[in-house]
Swiss-Prot record:
The lineage of its organism: Eukaryota, Metazoa, Chordata, Craniata, Vertebrata. Component of the ubiquinol-cytochrome c oxidoreductase (cytochrome b-c1 complex, complex III, CIII), a multisubunit enzyme composed of 11 subunits. The complex is composed of 3 respiratory subunits cytochrome b, cytochrome c1 and Rieske protein UQCRFS1, 2 core protein subunits UQCRC1/QCR1 and UQCRC2/QCR2, and 6 low-molecular weight protein subunits UQCRH/QCR6, UQCRB/QCR7, UQCRQ/QCR8, UQCR10/QCR9, UQCR11/QCR10 and subunit 9, the cleavage product of Rieske protein UQCRFS1. Pfam families: UCR_6-4kD. It is found in: Mitochondrion inner membrane. Belongs to the UQCR11/QCR10 family. One of its GO terms (cellular component) is respiratory chain complex III. It comes from the Eukaryota. GO terms for biological process: cellular respiration; mitochondrial electron transport, ubiquinol to cytochrome c. Keywords: Electron transport, Membrane, Mitochondrion, Mitochondrion inner membrane, Respiratory chain, Transmembrane, Transmembrane helix, Transport. Gene3D superfamilies: 1.20.5.220. Residues 39-56 are mitochondrial intermembrane. This is Cytochrome b-c1 complex subunit 10. The keyword Hydrolase does not apply. Residues 1-16 are mitochondrial matrix.
Amino acid sequence: MLSRFLGPRYRELARNWIPTAGMWGTVGAVGLVWATDWRLILDWVPYINGKFKKDD
């Protein structure tokens, strides 16, 4: 579908930039977790969620 709009040059550029964009996305996600309340985000991870039970 995307190849109908992009020529071969731009398809090759997009293919080369996919790993870089993925790495920056990962760095951004880790930075977001670091900058915000990490426990709030990690409560959604099932394995880690069980480790931090709230004592009521």
